[in-house]
């Protein structure tokens, strides 16, 4: 075997434009709304189930309440993270580079190739169009 094809990760960055900023802020806003809705739904369900459990076995209420509180705390952490992301994005200047989810590229390697030259790589896009590559 003299050659092999491998997947090499490529960093993807997006240049922040008004369009991208608006899109990302809208996505974050929708996610915050979804989490708030889920938290309200959890509160509603918890109140009903806790009241029902209190009628059956009052001693089982405390562990059940703790479960709901833990789940509510996890949801609050998600909401706090989303709000922090939103604040960070609002402060970013147009033209800033945002790290996005990396992609993979297929590279054919041969015996004796310099692995350092093959790894890495970066791609920059602006409004969905690739504008630059770098290694």
State where each predicted segment sits.
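Extended alpha-helical coiled-coil "stalk/arm" regions
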Residues: 34-61
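An N-terminal amphipathic alpha-helical segment
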Residues: 51-54, 62-80
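Coiled-coil termination/hinge junctions
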Residues: 72-122
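Short, acidic, Ser/Thr-enriched surface-loop or helix-capping motifs
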Residues: 125
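Short linear motifs in exposed loops
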Residues: 133-135
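Short, charge-rich amphipathic alpha-helices with coiled-coil/heptad character
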Residues: 1-25
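Amphipathic alpha-helical coiled-coil segments
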Residues: 21, 25-35, 39-42, 68, ...
């Amino acid at each position: 075997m003299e050659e092999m094809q491998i997947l090499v990760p490529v960093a993807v960055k997006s240049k922040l434009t008004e369009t991208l900023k608006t899109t990302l802020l809208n996505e974050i806003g929708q996610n915050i709304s979804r989490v708030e809705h889920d938290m309200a739904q959890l509160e509603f369900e918890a109140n009903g189930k806790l009241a029902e459990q209190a009628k059956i076995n009052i001693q089982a209420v405390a562990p059940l309440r703790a479960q709901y509180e833990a789940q509510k705390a996890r949801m609050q952490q998600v909401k706090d993270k989303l709000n922090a992301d939103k604040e960070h994005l609002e402060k970013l200047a147009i033209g800033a580079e945002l790290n996005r989810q990396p992609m993979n590229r297929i590279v054919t390697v041969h015996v004796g190739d310099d692995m350092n030259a093959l790894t890495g790589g970066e791609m920059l896009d602006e409004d969905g169009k690739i504008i630059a590559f770098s290694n």
